[in-house]
Amino acid sequence: MVAEIICVGTELLLGQILNTNSQYLAQKLAELGIDLYFQTTVGDNMERLKMAIDIATKRSDVLIFTGGLGPTSDDITKEAVADYFGLTLVLDEDILRRIESFFERRQVKMPQINKKQAYVPEGAKVLHNKNGTAPGLIIEKDGKIAILLPGPPFEMQPMFEEEVLPYLEKFSKQKIYSRVLKFIGIGESSIEEALKDLILSQTDPTMALYAKPFEVELRITTKKESEELAKSLLQSMEYRIRERLGEYIYGVDRQLLEEVVIGLLTEKKLKVSVAESCTGGLICNKLTNVPGASEVFDRGFIVYSNEAKMKLLGVPEQVLKEHGAVSSQTARFMAQGALSNSLSDIALSVTGIAGPGGGSETKPVGLVYIGIATKDNVESFEFRFSGDRLRIKEMTSKAALNILRKKIIDY
């Protein structure tokens, strides 16, 4: 079975709204083992929408629409689909009562235009909307299936989970199972080189690499009827990959680097403090976003100015004058200062030039030093990142968290 997603809305074409519906639906279809070869976005135009439907029916079995089910004149998805399949729209009294009740609960009189939403194509299965007034629809006609869903994600997602998912499961004999390995401290090309024989000979499971800022994801995928067999295949391939590159793998699936760090700190009963200059609190923010961080995160220092570095962390004025705020020496003193002015076992520091200005020939934009200190040792590491200010800050935070991760493992 082949599915196609058709997202309706001129606002999508204008870039005014981020289309998260396509991503969500694509993931759900993949989990079901339903092939998705095409995604289409079309504006609120009857002629162009019918054209998209005509193209989709020639190449796909299931058409999943999102958007265009509202009460206004530019909400035309239901009308376009009904007209294309030659179906008459009829008033559904049950839906009308639901819409009226929706407004009554809010003590608001129902606008007459909302009555439009109670008309459905004859013979369609109605999908109830618990969070809005637009019902969803499933239409089976001429060997094709059209599934119409509301555009707002908080309406669409519960409807899909509760009603569409069980409907589609009966068509899905095989499901797609996957495992994502998350790498850090190694580039995409180096991973591919190390796994070249596995990648070239892949049939089942398959592998695909995806580069992200300062990390790489490797997705292992298989399509099986049996979950037990799928897991066995994925685990076997993961073991072979870990044998070669295990030191660079920090997590799996949806794990975040900061979650792994907090988990390791908790496991070893350690506390950490962080001193940040160029990242301006980003590392502290990432760590404290993780539940349980309060047990292992002691404090953070945002020391943007030289005065703050001297006053709060005890960085010697002479060091700042001789080596500058962006230097390995300053990074080490910052880490030591954060350690001595806290109740932590480990202290992390970052200082750098995020840009776009402030760089020089000897110290260009993207130059970053990361320091880490324990009671027995202090180290610093140099990095040279590229990109805009936000990208450099993000990459710096990931590099710092990875250094912290490795230090905790060796502690």
Swiss-Prot record:
Annotated source species: Caldicellulosiruptor bescii (strain ATCC BAA-1888 / DSM 6725 / KCTC 15123 / Z-1320)
Lineage top rank: taxon: Bacteria
HAMAP family per the UniProt record, alphabetical: CinA_B
InterPro entries named in the record: CinA, CinA-like_C, CinA_C, CinA_KH, Competence-induced_CinA, MoaB/Mog-like_dom_sf, MoaB/Mog_dom
Family to which the UniProt record says this protein belongs: Belongs to the CinA family.
Name of the protein in its database record: Putative competence-damage inducible protein
